[in-house]
A protein has these predicted regions:
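Nucleotide-activated sugar donor-binding and catalytic core shared by glycosyltransferases
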Residues: 1-156
Length: 156
């Protein structure tokens, strides 16, 4: 399991929490050579999220747990990851609705449900399908933003 904390300054607290569960951690910044006995790999560096979205079969967007509007799922969907999220997706309602209609995203209600869903094996065909749909959704979103900007420019 890979964890990419939104706030890198919290890494020490996250490590303490994980290790209190008798799980072994490794931090990306330390460039560990052997990951054989590692339970949780923590990406504690900036600018590398895309690299990990490319290799992950599913992504849990933790920003959707708290009541702040959620987290943008397009980046992960673009790379073919299945999107798992909490109940708070208000800032991205239309995107999540579309992802759900293609069975790419799933709302998680309990920690136990999350644990059961992230343990499935990666299915190459599913990943390719999700990647294609994610790219289509991203292109559509970019087109809508371009249209919005062009309409605003015409008004001035």
């Amino acid at each position: 399991t890979i964890i990419i904390p939104r706030h890198v300054h919290r890494v020490k607290d996250i490590i303490l929490e994980i290790e209190s569960l008798n799980l072994k951690t490794a931090c990306h910044s330390k460039k560990p050579k052997n990951l054989t006995n590692i339970d949780i790999y923590i990406v504690d560096t900036f600018g590398e999220t895309n690299k990990f979205h490319k290799i992950g079969s599913s992504v849990f967007l933790g920003g959707s747990i708290i009541k702040r509007g959620g987290q943008n799922p397009l980046e992960a969907a673009r790379y073919g990851a299945r999107i798992l999220h909490g109940p708070n997706t208000d800032n991205f309602k239309d995107i999540y609705k579309l992802l759900k209609s293609f069975k790419i995203s799933k709302k998680i209600n309990t920690p136990k449900e999350l644990a059961s869903l992230i343990s499935f094996k990666k299915n190459k065909n599913t990943g390719v399908k999700i990647k294609k749909i994610g790219k289509i959704i991203l292109k559509k979103t970019i087109k809508e933003i371009d249209n919005l900007i062009n309409n605003e420019v015409k008004k001035t």
